[in-house]
């Protein structure tokens, strides 16, 4: 046969066991309202700080020093903030559940977990008041609501009757407005669907033909653009030269050097155009006397013209007397003029090289 303490789950105080049983098992908060808060908390914290750690969890002073210190701090906090003011913490029901049967939640040797759970529910500031967390009886409270009743249309306990009627009317207005809007949206959807169906039934084929024509127009426009691009490229590159002909490049006009003996192209052409009637004049001067004298004044030297050999009727070479003017043939005249021109050009090149 079990002893009294074992039947009371380790609770030594019989009155505390009855009160905790009524609160935890019967879900009746009557003891919290009848018994002063200071007396109830004094019995509860003694059981919490002394009996539970040593007799329920079997904690020893040497092994569970840290957990016992934390548990003592919890007891001191409850005495100072609630028992001294004769109020209960608003978590008093959860505290009673943990202290009534701690082995229902924790195993033996799990004192640390028990202390952790107490710290979460004891370190609070709000106090418990009458009716807080109480389960009203059907005679005193609102009758049990059926599952089929709409929650949004149920009565709110703290609103007066007039406010409840106004709230019901307001909700009915909202429902009517919402239903009307939904009706308009349905009509718009039906009209849109009908228009789309009619469009595909009547005008679908014509649109396909128009689309095909658009594709053809785009292809033709693309080909014309390509031809224009090719023509522009040909104009930029210019006409191609004919086969077998080399491109002619314009010669840049020679720059006249001031203070030099360089002859210009016009002076050379004048020398070509002068008639060479005789290879030597009567005074022994060069056919191009003016140019020869100009070169002599500038200090340039010129080689004597080549000896002219007169051709007789028998084609025998005869030496021409220097005292008489020689009678030259057409071929001899041409040779003399060409030799003079070559000599003049060589002098011009030498003078240019000396000036540089």
Swiss-Prot record:
<feature type="compositionally biased region" description="Polar residues">
    <location>
        <begin position="326"/>
        <end position="335"/>
    </location>
</feature>
<feature type="region of interest" description="Disordered">
    <location>
        <begin position="202"/>
        <end position="335"/>
    </location>
</feature>
<dbReference type="InterPro" id="IPR015267">
    <property type="entry name" value="PPP4R2"/>
</dbReference>
<dbReference type="GO" id="GO:0019888">
    <property type="term" value="F:protein phosphatase regulator activity"/>
</dbReference>
<dbReference type="GO" id="GO:0005737">
    <property type="term" value="C:cytoplasm"/>
</dbReference>
<dbReference type="GO" id="GO:0005634">
    <property type="term" value="C:nucleus"/>
</dbReference>
<comment type="function">
    <text>Regulatory subunit of the histone H2A phosphatase complex, which dephosphorylates H2AS128ph (gamma-H2A) that has been displaced from sites of DNA lesions in the double-stranded DNA break repair process. Dephosphorylation is necessary for efficient recovery from the DNA damage checkpoint.</text>
</comment>
<comment type="subunit">
    <text>Regulatory subunit (R2) of the histone H2A phosphatase complex (HTP-C) consisting of PPH3, PSY2 and PSY4.</text>
</comment>
<keyword id="KW-0539">Nucleus</keyword>
<dbReference type="Pfam" id="PF09184">
    <property type="entry name" value="PPP4R2"/>
</dbReference>
<protein>
    <recommendedName>
        <fullName>Serine/threonine-protein phosphatase 4 regulatory subunit 2</fullName>
    </recommendedName>
</protein>
<feature type="compositionally biased region" description="Acidic residues">
    <location>
        <begin position="202"/>
        <end position="240"/>
    </location>
</feature>
<comment type="similarity">
    <text>Belongs to the PPP4R2 family.</text>
</comment>
<dbReference type="GO" id="GO:0030289">
    <property type="term" value="C:protein phosphatase 4 complex"/>
</dbReference>
């Amino acid at each position: 046969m079990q002893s009294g303490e074992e039947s009371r789950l380790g609770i030594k105080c019989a009155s505390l066991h009855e009160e905790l049983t009524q609160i935890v098992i019967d879900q009746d908060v009557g003891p919290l309202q009848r018994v002063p808060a200071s007396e109830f908390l004094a019995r509860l914290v003694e059981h919490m700080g002394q009996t539970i750690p040593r007799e329920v969890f079997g904690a020893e002073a040497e092994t569970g020093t840290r957990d016992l210190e934390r548990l003592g701090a919890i007891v001191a906090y409850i005495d100072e903030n609630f028992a001294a003011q004769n109020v209960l913490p608003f978590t008093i029901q959860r505290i009673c559940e943990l202290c009534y049967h701690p082995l229902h939640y924790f195993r033996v040797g799990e004192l640390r977990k028990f202390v952790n759970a107490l710290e979460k529910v004891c370190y609070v500031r709000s106090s418990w008041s009458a009716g807080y967390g109480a389960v009203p009886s059907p005679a005193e409270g609102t009758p049990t609501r059926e599952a089929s009743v709409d929650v949004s249309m149920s009565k709110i306990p703290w609103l007066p009757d007039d406010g409840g009627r106004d709230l019901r009317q307001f909700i009915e207005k909202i429902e009517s407005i919402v239903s009307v809007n939904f009706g308009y949206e349905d009509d718009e959807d039906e009209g849109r669907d009908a228009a789309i169906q009619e469009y595909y039934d009547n005008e679908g084929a014509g649109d396909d033909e128009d689309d095909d024509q658009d594709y053809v127009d785009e292809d033709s426009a693309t080909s014309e653009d390509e031809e224009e691009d090719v023509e522009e490229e040909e104009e930029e590159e210019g006409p191609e030269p004919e086969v077998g002909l080399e491109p002619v490049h314009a010669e840049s006009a020679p720059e006249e050097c001031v203070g030099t003996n360089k002859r210009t192209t016009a002076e050379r052409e004048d020398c070509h155009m002068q008639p060479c009637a005789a290879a030597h004049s009567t005074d022994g001067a060069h056919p191009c006397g003016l140019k020869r004298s100009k070169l002599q004044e500038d200090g340039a030297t010129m080689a004597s013209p080549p000896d002219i050999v007169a051709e007789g009727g028998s084609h025998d070479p005869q030496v021409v007397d220097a005292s008489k003017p020689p009678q030259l043939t057409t071929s001899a005249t041409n040779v003399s003029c060409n030799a003079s021109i070559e000599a003049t050009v060589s002098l011009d090149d030498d003078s240019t090289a000396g000036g540089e």
